[in-house]
Amino acid sequence: MSRKLRTLMAALCALPLAFAAAPPAHAADPTTMTNGFYADPDSSASRWAAANPGDGRAAAINASIANTPMARWFGSWSGAIGTAAGAYAGAADGRDKLPILVAYNIYNRDYCGGHSAGGAASPSAYADWIARFAGGIAARPAVVILEPDSLGDYGCMNPAQIDEREAMLTNALVQFNRQAPNTWVYMDAGNPRWADAATMARRLHEAGLRQAHGFSLNVSNYITTAENTAYGNAVNNELAARYGYTKPFVVDTSRNGNGSNGEWCNPSGRRIGTPTRTGGGAEMLLWIKTPGESDGNCGVGSGSTAGQFLPEVAYKMIYGY
């Protein structure tokens, strides 16, 4: 069904409700406004495959990774963020596809881990950046993963820093609800081995989860979908018991095809997981991390930087060795 026809049908179906109270700005369902997910033609895997057509690994990387819909990450490297986010959302919209975007620029990013340290120069700089991010997407349908690791990275932070971070996330949700009404925003909730369900439920709630569409799990990690689903349900049980609501969640399945070996930073022998789809035990299973992109200078990516595409790692991940 074409985008225009779906939009017209939705409008016609809504006519009997014309005098009902307006739904909240973030209530639109972008999955019904599009026809499948957007595969980024300029992902690191796509660029490598295009630049190395004679490499014996290129065909497999192109077929199994580059052509799979996955997220594009946005941060300080993205230039004018409103323009960058708008161009990406617009390209997907032009193909009637749903894009997945990751906002990864919070002030004091990866403060305790360090492998991906950086982010905006100050809380006010981040507020401006995230407002422009949301404004760039505008009314186009999109999925946004909001600041991976931001609620798990508390181990070395003092209470004032935690309050500051939660305030930045709450403000980000306000911006998306005001400016991007057809975007589903998922606050990142780390992974099942980072914080217990009760702790994560509290952190999510205090950072404004009620204003978000849901939360994300396992971003850039390797833990099985089953373990993440059990954890997501446990977080929701805590949310229901403590605060009276639950939220849908998504799981990053890009690199969890054979689970975790206990290491999180470029472990060997990992395998790609279920390609991006709706359902599957969560609201969506998404490729949020690009398989083959380094976690940092560690493991089988020794000597690399976070985000660098490593073709040999990508190739081996297709087959799990």
Swiss-Prot record:
Domain of life: Bacteria
Keywords: Carbohydrate metabolism, Cellulose degradation, Disulfide bond, Glycosidase, Hydrolase, Polysaccharide degradation, Signal
Record EC number: 3.2.1.4
Substrates-to-products reaction catalysed: Endohydrolysis of (1->4)-beta-D-glucosidic linkages in cellulose, lichenin and cereal beta-D-glucans
Listed GO MF terms: cellulase activity
An annotated GO BP: cellulose catabolic process
Catalytic residue list: D110, D149 (proton donor), D295 (nucleophile)
Disulfide-bond pairs as recorded: C112-C156
UniProt signal peptide: 1-27
Record Pfam families: Glyco_hydro_6 (PF01341)
Main EC class the enzyme belongs to: hydrolase
Described purpose of this protein according to its UniProt entry: Implicated in the mechanism of induction exerted by cellobiose.
Family: Belongs to the glycosyl hydrolase 6 (cellulase B) family.
Protein name as it appears in the record: Endoglucanase 1
Originating species: Streptomyces halstedii
Gene (UniProt): celA1
